[in-house]
């Protein structure tokens, strides 16, 4: 079970980290189908999810299943690179 399945508030940071790695670093940690599922789940729970970076995530991007065009903070970039180092 993925961490965002246990804690819906983790959908935002994982969406942002996966998007940064994929669109900015050409690194894919999960399959496209799993990313699409993450986007769909986040879209369904969007109104109830709380996270400091929620403002970076639009319902339009989630509907399209993309994180292209996001302006990533240094915290997101750093966290994504740490995730890459530890991902199994």
Task: Describe each model-derived feature in a short phrase.
Residues 1-88:
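Phosphate/adenylate-binding "loop-and-lid" substructures adjacent to NTP/NAD/dNTP-binding pockets
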């Amino acid at each position: 079970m993925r961490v965002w399945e246990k804690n819906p508030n983790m959908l935002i940071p994982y969406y942002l980290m996966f998007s940064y790695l994929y669109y900015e670093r050409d690194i894919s940690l999960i399959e496209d189908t799993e990313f699409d599922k993450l986007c769909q789940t986040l879209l369904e729970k969007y109104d109830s999810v709380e996270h400091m970076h929620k403002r970076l995530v639009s319902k339009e991007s989630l509907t399209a299943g993309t994180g292209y065009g996001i302006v990533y903070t240094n915290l997101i970039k750093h966290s994504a690179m740490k995730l890459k180092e530890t991902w199994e």
